[in-house]
């Protein structure tokens, strides 16, 4: 927050503090881009929440959800130039924004916990030699 103030760009950011449920969805839906430059995130559900309401997402390759999301931009968490380029591209190119928005929403809406459970079960069965 201090850095944003020092650079005189406070009008470009919103730091809402802790939010709940519907508040989170409303803020994400009003956002141009969601960024999760996580060093290590076992899964990280917040990019899925952003994508579900049509907010293009930038995530780190190191986050667990990077393995399942095809329609999020992925960078290394330490590569701030790549993150800045991704933000710029999403904001500058309407077709890219629209594509990430629509395809991301569709992708997340088609993720089913039941399907994930079946995949895990198949892997267990394969490893245990049960079929």
Regions found by a protein language model. Give the residues of each.
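Nucleotide-activated donor-binding/catalytic signature segment of Leloir-type glycosyltransferases, i.e.
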Residues: 1-19
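Short glycine/serine-rich donor-binding loops of glycosyltransferases
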Residues: 44-47, 65
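Short hydrophobic beta-strand element within catalytic cores of glycosyltransferases
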Residues: 56-59
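Conserved acidic donor-binding segment of nucleotide-sugar-dependent glycosyltransferases
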Residues: 72-81, 89-94
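A charged, aromatic-enriched C-terminal amphipathic alpha-helix characteristic of glycosyltransferases
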Residues: 95-126
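Short alpha-helical donor nucleotide-sugar binding micro-motif in glycosyltransferases
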Residues: 18, 26-31
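Aromatic "clamp/platform" in nucleotide-sugar-dependent glycosyltransferases that forms part
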Residues: 39
């Amino acid at each position: 927050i201090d850095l944003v103030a020092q650079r005189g760009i406070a009008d470009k950011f919103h730091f809402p503090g802790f939010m709940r449920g519907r508040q989170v969805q409303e803020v994400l839906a009003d956002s141009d881009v969601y960024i999760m430059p996580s060093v290590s995130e076992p899964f990280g559900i917040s990019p899925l929440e952003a994508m579900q309401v049509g907010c293009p997402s930038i995530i780190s390759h190191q986050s667990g959800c990077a393995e399942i999301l095809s329609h999020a931009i992925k960078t290394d968490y330490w590569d701030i130039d790549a993150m800045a380029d991704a933000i710029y591209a999403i904001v500058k190119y309407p077709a890219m924004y629209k594509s990430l928005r629509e395809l991301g929403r569709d992708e997340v809406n088609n993720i089913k916990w039941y399907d994930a459970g079946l995949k895990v079960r198949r892997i267990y069965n394969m490893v245990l030699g049960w079929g």
